[in-house]
Amino acid sequence: MLGALADGRDLSAADTAWAMNEIMSDNATSAQIAAFGVAIKIKGPTPEELGGLATGMFEHARLVSIDGDAVDIVGTGGDRSGSVNISTMSSIVVAAAGVPVVKHGNRAASSKSGGADVLEALGVRLNLGPEAVARCVREVGIGFCFAPVFHPALRFAGAARREIGIPTVFNILGPLTNPARPRAGLVGCAFPELLEVVAGVFAERGASALVVRGADGLDEITTSDVTDTWVVSGGRMRRTTIDPTRLGIARVDLDALRGGDAEVNAGVARSVFAGTAGAVRDAVLVNSAAAIVAYDLSRGVGDPDADVHDALAAGMARAAAAIDGGQAAALLERWAKLSNTLGDR
């Protein structure tokens, strides 16, 4: 298998699922794991290969069973922008707007504050098990799957990943392996060469997603430039561009979206939920809107071939109402309170 990758040959989904099973069963050496992760990244993974790797991870995961549809708002990370936690804030706003959210995430790897870090600073308990996460979704409208809790066998790849210290195929798998397997997603990808490939995974699953990368490198919908976007629905993919100026958002310098550590970013989140206007609120509104669009598409609502700006404008209005009506701040308070009463089941 390593020889095939070294020769630039693609693997089947069955091949990569087998390889991931070997890794997560602790049957592979650190050298083999490192070589595999780097080789497939250098070759360039296919949707089939990524889908197989995700399948292998799901076979070892603690899965979450939820009632009905939900959306995830997640990114690969690795954009090194130092931005505030836009996807985390957007997740809370989307849930407050009435759309069920199951977010999958982890602590920061290459930044000062990951999604898990800022949620913890906001008072949300991280180490909840499948039943507790499902209860949060059922009672509050949002749950968080902390990756180490739900993918414990991934620890067997940890040493190899730390030793080589460069992005590998494992960096791409987080957005593809939400343990609740929601049918919709807003997915940011920091790697431009993989944007279409990641979209292809969702297309093969029959899921609905907006897969995005800002022209400034942000693994979110940016407001400093346009955003390269793949709209995925019903097994089909369409490429488009999101321009914030068409949504009434003035372009800003990327510095306006930069944050700090978890406590700083938690303070920014509280400020946004309190109704503070500005660049961060605008970014949260447009990303929240995109998640709402993806969720609607998963339920057969909306036209995936229509100009995405029209649907985004409607979604932004819903998101703004959830903030300005106090629902986002109230939901965060309820979520934090409930999560701290639950165990790790």
Curated annotation (Swiss-Prot):
One of its GO terms (biological process) is L-tryptophan biosynthetic process. GO terms for cellular component: cytosol. Mg(2+) 1 binds at residues 87, 220. Keywords: Amino-acid biosynthesis, Aromatic amino acid biosynthesis, Glycosyltransferase, Magnesium, Metal-binding, Transferase, Tryptophan biosynthesis. Mg(2+) 2 binds at residues 219-220. Its EC number is 2.4.2.18. GO terms for molecular function: anthranilate phosphoribosyltransferase activity; magnesium ion binding. Binds 2 magnesium ions per monomer. The keyword Glycosyltransferase applies. Pfam families: Glycos_trans_3N, Glycos_transf_3. Anthranilate 1 binds at residues 75, 106. Coiled coil: none annotated. It catalyses: N-(5-phospho-beta-D-ribosyl)anthranilate + diphosphate = 5-phospho-alpha-D-ribose 1-diphosphate + anthranilate. Pathway: Amino-acid biosynthesis; L-tryptophan biosynthesis; L-tryptophan from chorismate: step 2/5. It is an enzyme of class 2 (transferase). Its cofactor is Mg(2+). Anthranilate 2 binds at residue 161. 5-phospho-alpha-D-ribose 1-diphosphate binds at residues 75, 78-79, 83, 85-88, 103-111, 115. InterPro entries: Anthranilate_Pribosyl_Tfrase (IPR005940), Glycosyl_Trfase_fam3 (IPR000312), Glycosyl_Trfase_fam3_N_dom (IPR017459), Glycosyl_Trfase_fam3_N_dom_sf (IPR036320), Nuc_phospho_transferase (IPR035902). Catalyzes the transfer of the phosphoribosyl group of 5-phosphorylribose-1-pyrophosphate (PRPP) to anthranilate to yield N-(5'-phosphoribosyl)-anthranilate (PRA). This is Anthranilate phosphoribosyltransferase.
